[in-house]
Amino acid sequence: GSRILRHDPRSGETTDFRRYTNRTNGLAFSADGQLYGCQGGSRRIVRFNADGSTSLLEYRLDGHFHNHPNDLAIDEQGRIWFTDPYGRLPAPGPQLQGPLDHASVLRLERRVDRTWTIRRMTYDTTSPNGILVSQDQRTLYVAESDYGEDKRRELRAYPIREDGTLGPYTVLHTFGIDQRGVHRGVDGMCLDTEGNIIVCAGWERSGPGPMIYVFSPSGQVLETHPVPVDRPTNCTFGDADLRTLYVTTGEGHLFRVRNTGRQGWLLFPPP
């Protein structure tokens, strides 16, 4: 466990890229090909350097450790937007300082001297999960995935204002409760070239089950595709033409979906 794997679609071989990553979750490449990750075990965003080392970014918001970063998205200005829910597993060292009194979307951005600082961006989330920036950089998509019966599981769209702050969100889709229990809501997600949102959602214990959904930018459900195992966790397009969808699951699977009829959109494709 606690590894980052590298899959070669040409050979079909999957190998260790990094081991002992301290429960790293969401990953994203920057414009210069650097790989950044949400290191939940250390409650930090980190950069995985080519020489095998790891660089730590700023991890304090107003002097306090933030929570347990889950997923991240890097915009064309190089700012790192990340979701910061409360962790379900303890972090050994940083637990000496308790969590924040909120679970928000935060943003890492550079100061003039190139050091990092953190800003709080949302004040209306309780368990933010997957996150994306739209192609035109004007919308932030956030999965609010709080599992309580009286909580919200929504796919949200926040307008990104000219000054970089977020406007009031629009709910694109709500995941409710059925006779079997609470829907899991959205986990990870990605975009296609038409701006549609491909999301991993659901589980076997309630609702229509584990599923890949395709939403239009306005929230219309364009497609649903059942997943044969429980808890799809994240997805991205890959291969040379970005027409193959790769899906991970909480059970440790990696699925490859060909002939999707879609082409993925990545602001910064892997080097």
Which stretches of residues belong to each language-model region?
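Sequence-structural signature of mature extracellular/luminal beta-sheet repeat domains
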Residues: 1-271
